Amino acid sequence: MPTINQLVRQGREVEKIKSKSPAMENSPQRRGVCTRVYTTTPKKPNSALRKVAKVRLTNGFEIISYIGGEGHNLQEHSVVLVRGGRVKDLPGVRYHIVRGSLDLQGVKDRKQSRSKYGAKRPKKA
């Protein structure tokens, strides 16, 4: 434990809060270009083929981001909008791709939670 005199001379060091999405650089979203689109398997209790994309952002960061929803139209040079938000069962995936914006289409035939998947309101019969 420091003495009062030591605290007067040096002071306490403020703990820096580490960002959970450093590549965003305090932006809500970032634009990027897909460099690779592939599937990967989740951590232990779960089993699936999760769709992910490696994206080079406009600020130079290369990140792995998750493509939510059923089906997608992404290819290698697609331009996408990326937001923060990790996927708990995919290590290293700390970002999501925004559906229905830029080159990524919304989920087809989506009736519920449409705003999260960029789906337009269905036409009345």
From Swiss-Prot:
PROSITE patterns: RIBOSOMAL_S12. The modification 3-methylthioaspartic acid is found at D89. The keyword Transport does not apply. GO terms for cellular component: small ribosomal subunit. InterPro entries: NA-bd_OB-fold, Ribosomal_uS12, Ribosomal_uS12_bac. The keyword Lyase does not apply. Gene3D superfamilies: Nucleic acid-binding proteins. Keywords: Methylation, Ribonucleoprotein, Ribosomal protein, RNA-binding, rRNA-binding, tRNA-binding. It comes from the Bacteria. Residues 113-125 have a biased composition (Basic residues). GO terms for molecular function: rRNA binding; structural constituent of ribosome; tRNA binding. GO terms for biological process: translation. Residues 9-31, 106-125 are annotated as: Disordered. Belongs to the universal ribosomal protein uS12 family. With S4 and S5 plays an important role in translational accuracy. Part of the 30S ribosomal subunit. Contacts proteins S8 and S17. May interact with IF1 in the 30S initiation complex. This is Small ribosomal subunit protein uS12. The gene is rpsL.
